[in-house]
Swiss-Prot record:
SUPFAM superfamilies: Glucocorticoid receptor-like (DNA-binding domain). HAMAP family: Ribosomal_uS14_1. The gene is rps14. GO terms for cellular component: chloroplast; small ribosomal subunit. Keywords: Chloroplast, Plastid, Ribonucleoprotein, Ribosomal protein, RNA-binding, rRNA-binding. Part of the 30S ribosomal subunit. InterPro entries: Ribosomal_uS14, Ribosomal_uS14_bac/plastid, Ribosomal_uS14_CS. PANTHER family: 30S RIBOSOMAL PROTEIN S14, SMALL RIBOSOMAL SUBUNIT PROTEIN US14M. It comes from Nasturtium officinale. This is Small ribosomal subunit protein uS14c.
């Protein structure tokens, strides 16, 4: 189980990303439209004004049951070992083990 502080920090990052999403998107569009380099640098400075934690690359998917940030499966929202345990216990409908 992940620490509560780490899960809270991740939620805070998600809120910041939602808040500054439009600012980032609009300034990126402006950069692509303007041909002069000096104006692009001005807009680039504006792009760096939001906080670092509002960048979408800082977000991690976390397991719903354990909060683990690694080895997550998007379809289920679970980490690998929890997914395996739930499939073995037949708790996930439609998930089958493959063997060959």
């Amino acid at each position: 189980m992940a620490k509560k502080s780490l899960i809270y920090r991740e939620k805070k990052r998600q809120q910041l990303e939602k808040k500054y999403h439009l600012i980032r998107r609009s300034s990126k569009k402006e950069i692509s439209k303007i041909p002069s380099l000096s104006e692009k640098w001005k807009i680039h400075g504006k792009l760096q004004s939001p906080p670092r934690n509002s960048a979408p690359t800082r977000l991690h998917r976390r397991c719903f049951s354990t909060g683990r940030p690694r080895a997550n499966y998007r379809d289920f929202g679970l980490s690998g070992h929890i997914l395996r345990e739930m499939v073995h216990a037949c708790l996930l409908p439609g998930a089958t083990r493959s063997s060959w």
